[in-house]
Amino acid sequence: MFQGASALTLDAKGRMSVPSRYREALQGQAEGRVTVTKHPDGCLLLFPRPEWEVFRAKIAALPMDAHWWRRIFLGNAMDVDLDSAGRILVSPELRMAAGLEKEVMLLGMGSHFELWDSQTYNAKEQAAMAQGMPDALKNFTF
């Protein structure tokens, strides 16, 4: 299970160092193999390969009227491996799609991660908080 936020920096080649607290889990669960794809909210999704296969099967089974969503998720997916330094390479196409330049936020979302441009994430988080809690959380006890 992946959780927590990590402020990270992409190097000049577009590589991101995966926080050490996740590396062992990714090595054990997926032999260091991850799949990166677009998310319609403007970030990237990073899945350990076994979790990607579950997600991929769900997307592939969507009805024909969702064919563009299959293209977005599956057509943009790229398989990458952690290198010996614990880094993954985010392709130029995916970096451009998510507006990633240098400063990024990696969010553990349970079975997978979201990778955001730091400024974009902060702006979207502030906007969400300004709107107040959605009805689904109004009866939730913190």
UniProtKB/Swiss-Prot annotation:
It holds the Pfam family MraZ. One of its GO terms (molecular function) is transcription cis-regulatory region binding. Keywords: Cytoplasm, DNA-binding, Repeat, Transcription, Transcription regulation. One of its GO terms (cellular component) is cytoplasm. Signal peptide: none annotated. CDD domains: MraZ_C, MraZ_N. GO terms for biological process: negative regulation of DNA-templated transcription initiation. Its main location: cytoplasm. NCBIfam families: division/cell wall cluster transcriptional repressor MraZ. Forms oligomers. Belongs to the MraZ family. This is Transcriptional regulator MraZ. The lineage of its organism: Bacteria, Pseudomonadati, Pseudomonadota, Betaproteobacteria, Burkholderiales.
